[in-house]
Regions:
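Bacterial N-terminal signal peptides
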Residues: 4-15
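Extracellular ligand-binding/catalytic regions of CAZymes and related secreted enzymes
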Residues: 19-35, 50-51, 58-62, 231-333
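Helical hinge/lid and interdomain linker segments adjacent to catalytic or ligand-binding clefts
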Residues: 20-29, 38-40, 44-137
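Catalytic beta-strand/loop cores that center a nucleophilic Ser/Cys/Thr
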Residues: 22, 60, 66, 84-85, ...
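A structural signal for well-ordered alpha-helical segments within the folded catalytic domains
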Residues: 35, 49-53, 87-88, 95, ...
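Hydrophobic/aromatic beta-strand patches that form the interior of the parallel beta-sheet core
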Residues: 38, 68, 128, 222-226, ...
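A glycine-rich, often tryptophan-bearing local segment used as a flexible ligand/cofactor-contacting loop or short
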Residues: 107-198
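Catalytic metal-binding/acid-base residues of hydrolase active sites
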Residues: 126, 133, 229, 273-275
């Protein structure tokens, strides 16, 4: 009898321990009711574990989406560890996801985890990529999914997930890193795009610098926002004179993708997206609107929709190894 009881208890406990590796946020009432968004974090510098947690809470509490946030987890401690590049538990959630939001950097995931991402992409479901997702993966040559690596040159998917799905891979810092912040300027002819409802020049701002992208972007990309390089780290600082803003680099665009002949899916990419970038309401609105658009819900985008932060949000400054130590996903509820 005691043995049976012990077995039953252990069976009951397994799902609880597994679920502790990610965060689930149930949607309230709202246009997104019934839609499932999976947000995949995991970068060493820009605090995607903070940014995507807050974005998920906004999408759930303000807009009704059911959200699951996945993290880089140290398997020895169960703690969020962005420096652990080979473990993001819970990617099975992508099997039933309507949207993937991704903000990873140079991940070396095992084949079993990459298969979940590959299956999702082959289904043609939508993708929203933030900041370092342009160089989301750095997989070893022996990986079955090496073709998703940011710098691989094989004909199968040259420059990997970044270039082939999002529209660009890692190139360089265009603004001076940690010295020149970014102001968002609506691209010429883009003001009528539904993602930009409620967004004007200067509403989007972040302390992260503009990334270099190669111009023109690949065929089919529609630039929505340009990044004005500023002389300092405050929203009101003037723009840098000269070549850095002539022309300005795209920092947000849309496109469609298809993986190896599969169905086409919608993509929104922004090279912004650190947790500190989300301090600006315009940046939060850009991301929320992009999720609606990616899901084909652009008719539900309201210029005055609620993008207020949920709970306490004190983003950490971006820097390598700057994550808050000792935090487990359950601590973020």
């Amino acid at each position: 009898m005691r043995l049976l009881l012990a077995i039953l208890v252990s069976i009951c406990l397994v799902p609880c321990h597994a679920a502790d590796a990610w965060l689930t946020v149930a949607g309230a009432d709202g246009p997104g009711k019934g839609k499932r968004v999976v947000l995949v974090s995991g970068d060493e510098e820009y605090r995607s574990e903070e940014a995507l947690t807050q974005l998920a809470k906004i999408l759930a509490a303000r807009h009704g989406f059911d959200c699951t946030v996945l993290y880089a987890i140290d398997p020895a401690t169960g703690e969020i560890s962005p420096n652990t590049s080979d473990n993001i538990p819970g990617l099975e959630a992508l099997r039933t996801a309507d949207l993937m939001v991704i903000a990873t950097r140079f991940r070396k995931l095992p084949d079993a985890q990459m298969k979940e991402i590959d299956d999702y992409l082959k289904s043609g479901r939508p993708v929203v990529g933030l900041r370092t997702a342009t160089h989301a993966f750095n997989l070893p040559a022996e990986s079955a999914y090496h073709h998703y690596s940011w710098n691989q040159q094989a004909a199968r998917m040259p420059q990997g997930f970044g270039r082939q799905v999002l529209g660009e891979t890692w190139v360089a810092h265009h603004g001076a890193h940690g010295k020149e912040s970014t102001r968002g300027i609506v691209a010429p002819g883009a003001s009528g795009h539904p993602i930009l409802r409620g967004i004007a020049d200067g509403d989007i701002w972040g302390p992260t610098d503009v990334y270099t992208v190669r111009l023109p972007l690949p065929e089919g990309c529609e630039t929505l926002v340009l990044g004005q390089v500023l002389t300092g780290m405050e929203p009101g600082t003037p723009p840098v004179a000269g070549a850095k803003n002539e022309p300005m680099m795209p920092i947000a665009w849309t496109k469609h993708y298809a993986v190896e002949g599969g169905p086409r899916g919608r993509v929104f990419t922004t090279t912004m997206g650190s947790s500190s970038d989300l301090a600006a309401a315009g940046t939060r609105r850009l991301l929320v609107n992009a999720c609606y658009w990616a899901l084909g819900m652009e008719d539900a985008i309201a210029a005055s929709s609620n993008v207020d932060v949920v709970g306490t949000f004190t983003p950490s400054p971006f820097r390598n190894n700057g994550y808050v130590k000792g935090v487990k996903p359950a601590d973020l509820r």
